[in-house]
Amino acid sequence: MTQTLLAIENLSVGFRHQQTVRTVVNDVSLQIEAGETLALVGESGSGKSVTALSILRLLPSPPVEYLSGDIRFHGESLLHASDQTLRGVRGNKIAMIFQEPMVSLNPLHTLEKQLYEVLSLHRGMRREAAHGEILNCLDRVGIRQAAKRLTDYPHQLSGGERQRVMIAMALLTRPELLIADEPTTALDVSVQAQILQLLRELQGELNMGMLFITHNLSIVRKLAHRVAVMQNGRCVEQNNAATLFASPTHPYTQKLLNSEPSGDPVPLPEPASTLLDVEQLQVAFPIRKGILKRIVDHNVVVKNISFTLRAGETLGLVGESGSGKSTTGLALLRLINSQGSIIFDGQPLQNLNRRQLLPIRHRIQVVFQDPNSSLNPRLNVLQIIEEGLRVHQPTLSAAQREQQVIAVMHEVGLDPETRHRYPAEFSGGQRQRIAIARALILKPSLIILDEPTSSLDKTVQAQILTLLKSLQQKHQLAYLFISHDLHVVRALCHQVIVLRQGEVVEQGPCARVFAAPQQEYTRQLLALS
């Protein structure tokens, strides 16, 4: 007989602003059995995360108000539980993996200290016993050379590695119920498969229930027993996974299932001139030891990468987290030191100082993965987008800058009337459009796109890809597209480079690499996607 772990009964949640309450979760009912995985899917702003955070009462009250319904764990109410009862449940019986590890990990503490804290608080383990448990868990979530990484701080890890540490932190408590809010968003397909296998194994060992929030439908197919679809705060469809994927009944579910990235890259202009020529690019970070922190060695993270990129062309850079993708992008932007040759539009960049680089900078722009981190929360949209104009076109008046901001907001599909709002007032997809507008306003020739769609749900992802294609065709933009989502790469890129541990495994025309990969690692990535 199955045992109900969690029951959400007719839950409604609202946010109060002065005298009005805006309902963001409306009459939602969900149930999770022991050993079962329920996937919660839907676009950003649909109420998925608010529902999940409500389980452990992690939302600030006020402004949050629980308008109706209840949440029961083993039959006991969590919404009406005392703080002492909740402290006994949080982490011990119900653990949570958050989407953004940079917000969740303490930047001032080493990995070992943060992981030991979990074992000390929740399982009462001493440091000696905890050390082995920590190493084993880090190894299981795919952290290479785990013993050497224990003294690292969060900023010394790649985005995917930070997410794996977050997953390890949640699993160390051996919870009865795991709430996973987009836990594999920042991970490449190989590590993603490894994490999903680990979650399945632990679920079997512990008979653990799991609430898995994601916008990645391929993960839902592989992992979930049942699926609940949310739209505008309501649960519009709920069924077992096989039935829902085979015959969805709600129009919104049908739309979600049909929104996988598709299509071909935009046609290349003829003739297409070479815009970027990179030869033997190498990046190494110093290893410092001792009291005086002397350099004793170097960690080579990018090893002799060479490629050319033409005007109007997209080059995809794919590979597992920690493979050197983002480091390559930072080296091309001259934001970190590197060796080798970087020639942009006939101009060598490697030996230019900061002043000499300034006239070129507006022609090479970047859009980062997480607009929450890359957009200043204290500036409104007008101030964010016009910031580059203040640096590169200082003679423009405030009115001229505002006119350019209005024009570029139209171009990226944003309402210019919202230009005086702040980033927190926009959805994830809208924030990424703001980031694209900030890059586009300087009329660049090359945009480095570092995982620009990985944190977006499928419907919004498709809209951003369509936008990027139309902008590329209109302005003859070249893109360096960094991604672990091979479906997106296939739809956008003309050329592709596959990286592993800083080295080029395979490169060539995207159509050829996807149709007939030459290397085993590339074949593995494609098989897992």
Description of each model-found segment:
Residues V64, L78-A95, K113, L121, ...:
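ABC ATPase NBD coupling module
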Residues A129-K148, A399-E417:
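Conserved ABC ATPase "signature" region
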Residues D152-L157, E161, Y422-F426, Q430:
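Conserved ABC ATPase signature
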Residues V220-K222, V489-A491:
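A short, surface-exposed alpha-helical micro-motif characterized by mixed small hydrophobic
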Residues L172-E176, I441-S445:
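A short, proline-enriched helix->beta-strand linker immediately N-terminal to the Walker B motif
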Residues Y66-S77, G340-L349, I360:
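Conserved ABC transporter NBD signature motif
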Residues C235-N239, S247, V504-G508:
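ABC ATPase "signature
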